[in-house]
Amino acid sequence: MKLERVRAVRKRSRWFDGLLTHNPVLVGGMAIPFAVVITTSLKNSVSISILLACSLVPTVLLASLAGARLPRWGAPILYTLFSLALIVACVPLILPISPEVADSLGIFVPLLSVNTLLLTLCGRYADSRRKPVFALVDAVSYSAGFALIMCLLALLREWLGTGIIWGVPVRAPFTLSGIQITFTGFILLALLS
């Protein structure tokens, strides 16, 4: 009786694991360079979150469907190349946010294809014992958890650092220009953890 109840609770909580309890940035410590460096503006955070979701979900689904048939030494290379192709194809999706956002993200756009979050989830679902539905649920919830933390950090840093949110001046009680530097991103991330 108790085991069935535990399984039912775990099945329901899987939808929220990546958001709160097993957040990839706060709890897992994955993708910290993105959370620290890119979160100086909300446009950058939304853009990188869109690109991560567009690459993470199909790549983890590929790993769950074909991972058991791939050699263990070649699978991470294939996942990285597949993710990079998806990211390059999805860059036009972020250009309507702001024309200069692709330039401001710089090297972090191609680095999305080799981040720890992607390779960890692909490795987890590469064996044939796990169902692709669980891979899809985890990829979506981890993408949403990543986006939530990225946008929260960016909102705090942009508002308190410049008094602007998404290019619109918003009255802030005070502005601290030092909150825009990378070191402060580490401190804010630690406070949220």
Identify what each model region corresponds to.
Residues M1-F16:
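Intrinsically disordered, low-complexity non-transmembrane regions of multi-pass membrane transporters
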Residues P92-Y142:
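Membrane-proximal helix-loop-helix units in multi-pass membrane proteins
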Residues T59-R72, L119-R130:
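C-terminal ends of transmembrane helices
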Residues A31-V36, L52-A53, V57, L84-P92, ...:
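Hydrophobic core segments of alpha-helical transmembrane domains in multi-pass membrane transport
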Residues L42-P58, L78, A102-S113:
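Structural signature of hydrophobic alpha-helical transmembrane segments
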Residues S64-L78, S98-D103, W166-L176:
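Membrane interface segments of multi-pass transport proteins and intramembrane proteases
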Residues S13, P132-S193:
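C-terminal transmembrane helix-loop-helix hairpin of multi-pass membrane proteins
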Residues P71-S83, S104-P110, D138:
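Cytoplasmic-side transmembrane-helix entry/capping segments in multi-pass membrane proteins
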